[in-house]
Structure formats: structure tokens, C-alpha cells
A protein has these predicted regions:
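Conserved helicase C-terminal RecA-like lobe
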Residues: 4-190
Length: 190
């Protein structure tokens, strides 16, 4: 969950999409509960805008006075404006720190969740080292989306295409091997 939260913060900076907004709007708590989120949904539909834009437009509304919504908007605006030319790892660290998310996990006391965030940070650094010219936030998010979409288990009946090497250690009720050449698979050396 913490990795998805962290990636949602990055997606919110890049795309301001509804799914990312819904995931992180109240994590850590910003007093944006169900009633306020429903208000934003209705406003967004009525005014044909995103949930994030709805929040930006409604900051002065009485309903959002006792919330930390203004801080969230300020954070997103400031970091997204300055994300060009910055490293993704630096951006990730800053958003986790300034949003209070990392501190939230520390006070929760879950070392495993903090370790997962550290692993995400390391994977971002690894990506940046091998990324070259295409090492932008949007490229990274597209790269990560490929993994999360392909790794997702739909739980539905489906045909999974993979190499023999990728299937090693997995179990399936039925397996079909295509284009076998005698002497190559299985190898004559085995």
C-alpha cells in the first residue's frame, strides 16, 4: 500500500488524475473525509473538471476551512512546477517528507512499510542510473505502470504467455510449449 501511495503522490504531481488524488488526498489525515470528497465529486461532475481542480476551486468554501487541503494544493503546485530538471529520487523524497507521509509511517511504527519505501527509492535511483535521456517523471511513471499492469493478477480465466525461464517455479493446471525443436528443449546435454 505504501508503494502505491508514494507512486500516487508522483502521479498526482505529473497528471493530477482522480485515482491518485483519491488515494492520497487524506493520507496522512487532512480531514478530507467522505462528506467532503462527495462534495468534490459532485462539484467536479457539475463543472466538468478533475477532483484536484475541484479542490483548488473550493479551498475558500466553508466546508474546507478546518482541513489541510490548502497545504496539499500548495505542495502539489510547488513540486509540480519545479519538477522539470530535478531527479525523480529527489522529488520522491521531497514529496514523502513534505506531505508528512514518511513521518506518518514512522509514527505508525511499521518498519516493514518504511523498508518498502526505501526499496522504492532505491529502484528510482537505479532507474535514473540506467534511464539516460528519458529519465523524466512521466517516463518513470509509464515504466512503472507497465510492471504493475503486467504483474496484476486478474483472477480470471486467461492465457498467460511467457518464456520457459519466466515460468520457472510457477504452477499452472495446463501448460503448452510451442515451437519445440528436438534436441534444443529439452537439451541433449540434460
Amino acid at each position: 500500500a505504501e508503494v502505491k501511495d508514494a507512486l500516487s503522490y508522483l502521479r498526482l504531481l505529473a497528471y493530477r488524475d482522480a485515482l491518485s488524488f483519491l488515494r492520497v488526498a487524506n493520507v496522512p489525515r487532512r480531514n478530507l473525509g467522505r462528506r467532503r470528497m462527495e462534495f468534490l465529486r459532485e462539484y467536479a461532475v457539475k463543472n466538468s473538471c478533475t477532483l484536484y481542480d475541484a479542490l483548488c476551486r473550493c479551498l475558500d468554501d466553508e466546508l474546507f476551512k478546518g482541513t489541510k487541503a490548502r497545504r496539499l494544493v500548495a505542495l502539489v503546485e510547488e513540486l509540480s512546477a519545479g519538477c522539470e530538471g530535478r531527479s525523480i529520487a529527489e522529488l520522491l523524497s521531497e514529496v514523502l517528507n513534505r506531505s508528512g507521509y514518511e513521518e506518518y509511517l514512522r509514527t505508525e511504527g511499521s518498519q516493514e512499510r518504511l523498508d518498502n519505501l526505501a526499496e522504492l527509492k532505491q529502484s528510482v535511483r537505479d532507474y535514473e542510473e540506467t534511464g539516460g535521456e528519458e529519465c523524466t517523471l512521466t517516463h518513470y511513471l509509464a515504466h512503472v505502470a507497465l510492471f504493475t499492469n503486467s504483474d496484476a493478477d486478474t483472477g480470471k480465466d486467461a492465457v498467460k504467455l511467457m518464456t520457459v525461464h519466466a515460468a520457472k517455479g510457477l504452477e499452472f493446471p495446463h501448460v503448452f510449449l510451442c515451437c519445440l525443436n528436438e534436441g534444443i528443449l529439452p537439451s541433449q546435454k540434460t
